[in-house]
């Protein structure tokens, strides 16, 4: 009897199409298309005045791509001159979203700028401008497709297939991770 009840419970819980609420730090049509399905509610935190009211609903948070992160967020005054547009409101919002997701163990994804913000919010730093700080033969801001190979330092088979030591990455960035937090 116990096994029968357990199987019914598992079967019933697997059949539920529970709605999941995903909070985007700043929405765009591409993110909405990527996430859109019948079981997902997408909330754009950037357009909501009281973000505390939506944080309690979050099943996941996505920090999206966008403007440069203010170098003052990682104590860098030198790179202020080479940064593009800085959105102070967004920097503050994404730190709040990161802290909430981290403290509450809510799944968190960072895309482009979002991944950089995750690094900064964890205590890391960024290259404010990759070409001027480390030099590169890769043109990061040309028109068209911008991809190049990078060499992997950690070739963990948990993330990449065995034997993988290089991967292709998007290069439409002039900022990148510099120091990773411990």
Regions found by a protein language model. Name each.
Residues 1, 13-111, 119-127, 131-168, ...:
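N-terminal beta1-alpha1 cap of cysteine-dependent amidohydrolase-like domains
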